[in-house]
Amino acid sequence: MIKKTLLSFTILANCTFLFAAEVDHYSVPAKLIPNSSALVYEKVQNYLQMALNEANVLSSCNEDILYKKMRLYFNNHTKGKLTQDVIYDEGFPSVRIKLEESIFQDWSIYNGFLLGREKAKKSALALGPIMKIDNQVLGTDKLEHFFGSGFLYFKRHHKNGTDLLKVLKRGAFYEKTILGGNFLATGVFSYADLAANFNGMRFWNHVLQKDDDVLGAEENLGPYVSCEQGQWVQVKEINLAEYLDDSFDESKNCSKFATSRGYEKYTSRLKLIEGLRGVDFNCLSSTENNSYLTEKYQSRLRNGDPIHHWIINQNGHEQVSYFNEF
């Protein structure tokens, strides 16, 4: 029994660090977060061209090779050059918040081991930087989810034909376990991560645009790449702003927590920050914002659920339910 528990913990620890752990959307005002759009788009353009060139050397419009080469640059921090640049380059325009000065400063190993342990204070992955792209504030971890988990969603639904509801359920299961929302991981169940995963799936589908967008054909943004005379060529520039919205922002698309004590610590610290900054961060306070997001993601799944049911938190901060959350 002890061996099984240790094995489960080891698996959780290794899988969780495939992604930067958490972010703090509260401690620094949005106006103080530098806009990194120009640099991000320059890197996106350069890395896409590098991927196309490398794919063209190896084949004549082979899709699997194209995706393989693109994922060398667009992936999580263990594999993707873009996310590595964003997370590890201290000169990259973003804001880095020390764990001991963040909303998670009261966290203990009992609230979320990977975020509460002493080593987390020295880890670049414990608390990801906050950045701004086209005036949308997001954590750098959301780029990892967008490109990394987004590709897995894309592969399951668009490549393998798995029903979208099953794909979203699987994503929620992973978020509850190996990707955060478990007290052996960070203890934070992030709806914003799920929103980034979903929109990343849309992005990867748009690369070649072989299927209509899951939100409707009117949302088709691709193709970005096309096969011409046996070579992959870029036919449209990638505009990340067309995917980013407030569902990526954890101060507006609230997270839930693995333990009741973690929930209490988080919300208590949030009240202190609100008092210091004179801001109400209640993610349910903006009816206009909620209406916009629920309308955008209103497409129905086969069981009748709107997509927003799986990626937008409409209940506010609370302890996550492991069996009845959805």
Identify what each model region corresponds to.
Residues 5-14:
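Sec-dependent N-terminal signal peptides
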Residues 20-170, 180-194, 198-326:
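Intrinsically disordered, low-complexity, mixed-charge
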Residues 1-2:
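N-terminal secretory signal peptides that target proteins for export/translocation
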